Amino acid sequence: MTATFKAIRNTELPHAFRQVRLELAREPGHPEGDRGIAYVMLAPLDAEGRIDARLWQKHRDACRVVRLRPDVEDERGHLVHRPGGSWAFTYDVAGASPDESGYHFSNERFIPGEYVSIKEADGFHAFRVAAVTAL
């Protein structure tokens, strides 16, 4: 069962919510990175650019992600906070598919030019924070 969404108006969310675009950074097979391999995340960020867990708790349904890949339909999911404090992207609300883990997302700063790691099915990949925009 894939993630389902109800419409949310930007005006219903706190001003801390941002749209964050993460693009694949340079790695073997992608010496220039790849703008087409990306994630677009909607999440509350604190003044330092870190995910605000308190606001996430209050507005968790609004914390969404879209997984972008060339020639593949976009996958829509949610940003989830797991027991122990780790963050992940989940696309399957029934829990049958594995989540994509954000490596140290709780410590990462989501500001343009910074890098974050995401564990996908084939291992960890570095993504560059390409843009952070207010809603």
How does the language model describe each region?
Residues 6-9, 38, 72-78, 114:
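Short small/polar-residue motifs
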Residues 90-135:
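Short, compact, well-ordered microdomains
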Residues 22, 39-43, 76-81, 127:
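Broad, structure-driven detector of short, well-ordered beta-strand segments within folded domains
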Residues 56-109:
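Short, conserved turn/kink motifs that form compact alpha/beta structural patches or helix kinks used as
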Residues 13-17, 34, 72, 82, ...:
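A generic structural signal for short, non-catalytic loop/turn and secondary-structure boundary residues
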Residues 10-14, 79, 108, 118-121:
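A general structural signal for short secondary-structure junctions and capping/turn motifs
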Residues 1-57, 67:
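N-terminal intrinsically disordered, low-complexity, charge/repeat-rich segments that act as generic
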Residues 19, 86, 115:
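Exposed beta-strand and adjacent loop surfaces of beta-rich binding modules
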